[in-house]
Amino acid sequence: MDKFVIQGGVKLEGEVRISGAKNAALPLLAAMILADTPITLKNVPDLKDVRTLVKLIGGLGITMSYEGETVIANTSTLDNQFAPYELVKTMRASILVLGPLLARYGSAKVSLPGGCAIGSRPVDQHLKALEALGAQIEVEAGYVHAKVDGRLKGGEVIFDMVTVGGTENILTAAVLAEGVTTIRNAAREPEITDLALMLIKMGAKIEGLDTDTLVVTGVESLHGCEYSVVADRIETGSYLAAAAITGGKVKTTHTDPNLLESVLDKFEEMGAEVTRGEDWIELDMLGKRPKAVSFRTLPHPEFPTDMQAQIMAVNAIGRGFATISETIFENRFMHVPELARMGANIQVEGNDAVVTGVEKLSAAPVMATDLRASFSLVLAALAAEGETIIDRIYHIDRGYEDIEAKLQGLGAQIKRVSE
C-alpha cells in the first residue's frame, strides 16, 4: 500500500494547473450513455474513480476510448444494462448510470454503491424521484432493479433534501421523458450546471440553470457532441490552502474564480492577498501566520463541505480560534484525531468543531480516512516540523490528479513510497 513521506516547513511558491473536476466528470461520463451518436468529453482528470466509471460503462457494451484527457463513447454497441457490485462497490457515483439507462433503454440493474464512508448518504432520494417519472423500482439482494413501460413520463419531483447525485440522476432521466419535468429543491452546484450545459449541447431542453428549480422538456433522442469538463473548484481551493498554511504564494491556472467565492472570502479573512483573473487565482499569504476563521458548510453557493477539512487544517496553525459547523454530512470530522496526533487543538461536539490555533504542528505518522480528509493531512504535513508519513493514500488518488508532481512543482518535499 502506498504512503506519502512529506518533509514539512517549506513555503510553497509557483504555479499549478488545475484539472477537470471529478465531481463534474463522473455525471458527464454517465450522461454519455444518452447519446445516440459518438460523443467526446475533454479535460477529463486521470483518477481512479474516473477509470472505474469508464470501465463500468464499457462493461455495458459501449465502445470507450480513453486517451490522455479525452474520452470518446459510442453507444451503438451497448448490449446490456447491468452495473455489477464488483465495479460499483468502490464508488458512489456509479449509481449515476441508473437514470440514463432507464431513460434510454427502459431498464437497468445497478448495484447499490460504495465510496467514502461519510455518513449514510442514502440513494432513496434518487429512487423516489425516478418513481415520480413512472419508473418501477425494486431493491433486492443489494441491487436496484428499475424498469419502465415505454418512455418515462414527465412529472413533478420535490427532493426532501438537497442532493447533488439525486439531482444529476433525475436530470439525465428527465431529458428523454415524455412531457415536462419540474425538479424542485434541486442542488445548485456548478457541476450540475456543467451537466445541464452538456445535455443542452446534446439537444436537451433545460431551464432554470443555477437555481433550485429545473424545468426539463423531454425530447425523443439526444445526439453526441464535444464538451470539456469544468475546472475542479475543490482542487483549486486545496492548492490555495497549501499556500495559506505554508505562508507561501501560489497561482492556480485553468480554473474559474466565480465557482469559489465563499472559500476565497475566507482566505481573505485569514489575511491572505487573493488576486483573481479570468481563469486564474493567486493567493499570497505574505509569509504571515493566517488568522483562524469560522464557517458553516452549506449547499452551493455557500461554503462547500468538500473544503471543510482543508480549511480546518489551516485553522490548526492559525491565530486565535474558530468554530466549524458541518451541516451537510454527519461523521465528517474523521481527520480530527489524525490532526491531533500532529499537535492540533480541536474539540468536537456533535457537528461542530472548535479549533484553537497552535504556532507549530509536529510530524507524526497519520492515516487518511476519506478523500478530502487526506488532503488536510497533506496540508498539515507541509506545515509541520519534521517528516510526516501518511498511510492509506489511495483515498487521495480518488480525487486529486498527479498530486505529488503538482506539489513538487511548488517546492514541496513529498514522495510516494510503496510498501
From Swiss-Prot:
Record localization: Cytoplasm
Positions with a binding annotation for UDP-N-acetyl-alpha-D-glucosamine: R92, R121, P122, V123, D124, Q125, D306, I328
EC number: 2.5.1.7
GO biological process terms on file: cell division; cell wall organization; peptidoglycan biosynthetic process; regulation of cell shape; UDP-N-acetylgalactosamine biosynthetic process
Active site: C116
Positions annotated to bind phosphoenolpyruvate: K22, N23
Keywords: Cell cycle, Cell division, Cell shape, Cell wall biogenesis/degradation, Cytoplasm, Peptidoglycan synthesis, Pyruvate, Transferase
Family matches, as SUPFAM superfamilies: EPT/RTPC-like
Keyword DNA-binding: no
The UniProt record lists the keyword Transmembrane helix: no
Record function comment: Cell wall formation. Adds enolpyruvyl to UDP-N-acetylglucosamine. Target for the antibiotic phosphomycin.
Family of the protein in this entry: Belongs to the EPSP synthase family. MurA subfamily.
NCBIfam families to which the protein is assigned, alphabetical: murA (TIGR01072), PRK09369.1 (NF006873)
Name listed for the protein in its UniProt record: UDP-N-acetylglucosamine 1-carboxyvinyltransferase
Record organism: Acinetobacter guillouiae
